[in-house]
From Swiss-Prot:
Pfam family, one: NTP_transf_3
Lineage of producing organism: Bacteria, Pseudomonadati, Pseudomonadota, Gammaproteobacteria, Pseudomonadales
Record text on subunit structure and interactions: Monomer.
GO cellular component, one term: cytoplasm
Localization, UniProt: Cytoplasm
InterPro entries in alphabetical order: MobA-like_NTP_Trfase (IPR025877), Molybde_CF_guanTrfase (IPR013482), Nucleotide-diphossugar_trans (IPR029044)
Enzyme Commission code(s) on record: 2.7.7.77
Protein's UniProt name: Molybdenum cofactor guanylyltransferase
Amino acid sequence: MTSNTPLPPCSILLLAGGRGQRMGGQDKGLVEWHGEPLIVHLHRKVRPLTDDLIISCNRNRERYAPFADRLVSDDEEDFPGPLAGIRAGLKAARHTHLLVLPCDVPRIDLALLHNMREAAGLNSEKPLMLRHDDHWEPLLCVIPVALLPAFENAWNAGERSPGRVMRNLDAQALVCPDNDPRLANLNTPELLSSHNTVSD
């Protein structure tokens, strides 16, 4: 990848609006890792990268508010899934692109975030998703905000998979190494515990 690729201006969306089933119903972004809520780790990584930091959350808004420029919520009740949060983020975004991250990837680093933006700039009209171990990571992506109508059309047609929506829009892949530790989803108590010996 060339170092002179322009980086698209990005709003950043942190997804923290899920039901937290794998965490026993806990609000996942507020679960602690290394003594701090997961959302704090993500905020520390991304805050210097944008002046438009959005958090998608459906509860505990007062606890998330200090870590975002704006909060968004799903437009339907009963936790309809991450595509609802992405749609809300696209509607709120002030920049041309929306970089999306789940709240349970505290080991992501600045180099990968830079690479995501740089790769998105190579074909700025297409969504970009991370890919590793022969599968996509649809919640680690960069989406042109101009594609909001396509996301809305897919939602209204009954689609609920962000990955399918983006693949249907000819998503680009940013390929990461197999078993890349930066992509570890710490979405169960067991995974949080197993990664507690490794700092972010």
